[in-house]
């Protein structure tokens, strides 16, 4: 991902700037090398205390074998240049080539040999132990009951919950991995992109548009309030929400006779497909409803289908970047920037 590449470049420049141009003799080189190894060994054994959702945990200052038990933790580590040795499966990855992780980071994990650790709510404890991790990152909302078992394997740091907390969770995971400064830089870069989008929308007279977010699945439909991942980002950009949607909370179930409730200036929707085609069939059924067809937002060609993984399930910094890209492409289309991302390849390959 470009943010992590910028950070890596900055670190390299810092290291090079600190190098002495003088050439020491071989004895000095030997002493320096031995001292460096000793310092490194000492640093590797150093620990620090981290406050998190389950209390305070003592972690290694420089963990090398990190296990991630949420997708947002996986994204956090990848964005900071750390590839987990093991990671839980992504939820609802139907149709993805890798079959285990979301397409915007799955190939990176696959190429690195990252071990599949099962589902977020049913992790494979034996597989985790076999990896001999020195840090485990998880979430209280999913794994509170097995926290003690995980802590018996390695120092374990938990975030609290998914809803409306993607930024806080990034900082929690980064703190566990001694990468809080890097995470702060990532958020600053993301904020700069969000503020630039806000300024561009304002200049185009489009910042006051009301934005609705809708999900279709086999069992029905819903629209989202302000505490979902995507709507939190929409609000941070400064875009407006329809009055019915502009409230604290997660989502509202939708019935077909209440379709007019989702009208807005712009509507983004995604489909939670699980591999049997039923959600896609439900999508087509909803879109064919007369009440849907009569919506002003539909008549104005202001409906945009986006990726369910990045907009609704992954909750990470990489996904947050994709949502910004999709908002720009939909609301400020240009000749070279008018495609909504379907995330068919890893974000890190997009540069």
Q: Where in the sequence are the language-model features?
A:
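Basic- and aromatic-lined ligand-binding clefts that recognize polyanionic substrates
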Residues: 65-68, 73-77, 184-240, 244
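A short, structured surface patch at a secondary-structure boundary
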Residues: 74-125
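Bacterial N-terminal signal peptides that target proteins for export
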Residues: 1-7
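Structured C-terminal subdomain patch of bacterial secreted/periplasmic proteins
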Residues: 204, 265-351
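Proline-aspartate-enriched helix->loop->beta-strand connector
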Residues: 125-127, 132-137, 155, 263-267
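Extracytoplasmic ligand-binding site segments that recognize negatively charged/polar headgroups
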Residues: 91-97, 143-145, 159-172, 208-231, ...
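C-terminal motif of bacterial Sec signal peptides marking the signal peptidase cleavage site
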Residues: 15-18
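Short, low-complexity, disordered segments immediately C-terminal to signal peptides
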Residues: 20-42
């Amino acid at each position: 991902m470009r943010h992590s590449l910028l950070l890596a470049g900055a670190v390299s420049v810092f290291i090079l700037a600190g190098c002495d141009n003088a050439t020491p003799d071989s004895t000095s080189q030997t002493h320096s090398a031995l001292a460096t190894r000793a310092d490194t060994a000492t640093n590797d054994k150093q620990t620090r205390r981290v406050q998190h959702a389950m209390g305070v945990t003592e972690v290694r200052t420089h963990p090398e074998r990190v296990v991630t038990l949420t997708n947002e933790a996986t994204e956090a580590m990848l964005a900071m240049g750390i590839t987990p040795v093991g990671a839980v499966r992504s939820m609802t990855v139907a149709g993805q080539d890798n079959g285990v992780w979301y397409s915007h980071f799955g190939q990176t994990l696959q190429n690195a040999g990252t071990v599949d650790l099962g589902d977020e709510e049913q992790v494979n404890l034996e597989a985790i132990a076999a990896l001999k991790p020195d840090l485990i990152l998880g979430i209280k909302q999913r794994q509170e009951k097995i926290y003690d078992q995980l802590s018996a394997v390695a120092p374990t740091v938990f975030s609290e919950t998914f809803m409306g907390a993607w930024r806080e969770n990034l900082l929690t995971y980064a703190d566990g991995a001694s990468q809080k400064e890097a995470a702060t830089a990532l958020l600053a870069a993301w904020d700069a992109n969000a503020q630039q989008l806000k300024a561009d929308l304002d200049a185009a007279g489009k910042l006051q548009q009301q934005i609705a977010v809708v999900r279709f699945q086999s069992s029905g439909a819903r629209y989202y309030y302000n505490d979902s991942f995507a709507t939190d980002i929409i609000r941070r950009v400064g875009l407006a929400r329809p009055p019915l949607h502009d409230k604290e909370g997660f989502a509202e179930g939708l019935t077909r006779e209440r379709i007019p409730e989702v009208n807005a200036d712009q509507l983004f929707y995604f489909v939670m497909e699980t591999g049997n085609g039923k959600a896609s069939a439900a999508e087509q059924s909803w879109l064919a409803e007369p009440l849907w067809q009569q919506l002003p937002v539909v008549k104005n060609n202001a409906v945009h289908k986006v990726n369910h993984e990045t907009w609704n399930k992954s909750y990470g910094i990489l996904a947050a970047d994709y949502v910004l890209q999709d908002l720009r492409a939909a609301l400020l289309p240009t000749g070279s920037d008018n495609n909504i991302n379907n995330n068919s390849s890893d974000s890190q390959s997009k540069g």
